[in-house]
Amino acid sequence: MYCTRAVSDAVTWVGGNDRRLSLFENLFPIPRGVTYNSYLILDEKTALIDTVDASISRQFLENIMHTLAGRHLDYLVVNHMEPDHCANIEELLLRFPELKVVGNAKTFTLMRQFYDFDLEGRIITVVENDTLSLGAHVSTNKL
């Protein structure tokens, strides 16, 4: 069952909660677990901002599919490659064959080191001040 939250008319939180963890980074107490934030922007084009930890993949994917409501996912924006933010990249590439992954050069260096999937023709490498237009929403890359 999906669990999402509208942030605005066009932005929906599609992340999830992991109540199993008691320590963040095995150091800091988190008595109520941790929340993995991911946002889906629906415009002329669609963009998912980050993914989540593998421990909540099922919930996360249900949230995305529910929010897309049959629409295609155009872009996945990867802000950084920590495992709790990028564990679902491969699954999204499989589910959405036209999906483009947006990130900086280091993102794709790390992605190729961590994963064994083909990114040929599926990446958009951004540099400072590049923009990504989804329609009414435009994202500007600030490094």
Please identify what each model-predicted range represents:
Residues 4-64:
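Conserved beta-strand hairpin/beta-sheet module of binuclear metal-dependent hydrolase folds
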Residues 5-9, 103-143:
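Metallo-beta-lactamase
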